[in-house]
Amino acid sequence: SDGMGIDAIFDKLPNLKRKAGLVLIPTTCGTGSEVTQLASINRTRLGTKVGMGCPDMYADTSVLIPELLYGLPNYVFATSSIDALVHAVESVLSPNATPYTKLFGYQAIEMIIKGYQEVEKGGVEARNRIMGDFCIASNYAGISFGTAGCAAVHALSYQLGGKYHVPHGESNYAMFTGVLKN
């Protein structure tokens, strides 16, 4: 980016070329972006969050290290894993969904729900034991939404998150049931 501000990067994104290899290591169990060409950024000046992407944003290597997530505060774990769940649900419902994206999306949904049930029974100790499953589920959701896309939940949550600085997973949660009911 050669010292460019975020507005310049965003405007020139299609023409930017990476100058070095890219290794991505997620530190939450939410976005799955380590396997996509996509990122969400807060455009504070505009009062919104936006998605951005270009082929050079694909990682050369992506590494999942569940132990990095052991110390996540409960709130961060909850909001980031809800983001993964919403990614998976929106991607399987997307008109762009394929058998491939549905395979990964449905598997992510199953793993996340099963994980929540385990955490409910066993607390933080159980969460740490199955953190690898949450990392994989988030990764699967990333594979699914990276191709199929997201939809109304994300479109609405970007506005809430950008204007009021609500964490992405929390704003997704706030919109999720209302959007699915309609």
Language-model regions, residue ranges each:
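Glycine-rich flexible loops
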Residues: V86, A97, Q159, K163, ...
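Gly/Pro-rich interdomain helix-loop hinge
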Residues: K163-N182
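Carboxylate- and glycine-rich phosphate/diphosphate-binding segment that chelates Mg2+/Mn2+
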Residues: L38-A148
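Glycine/threonine-rich beta-strand-loop-alpha-helix active-site module
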Residues: S1-P66
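Histidine-centered catalytic micro-motifs
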Residues: A151-G169
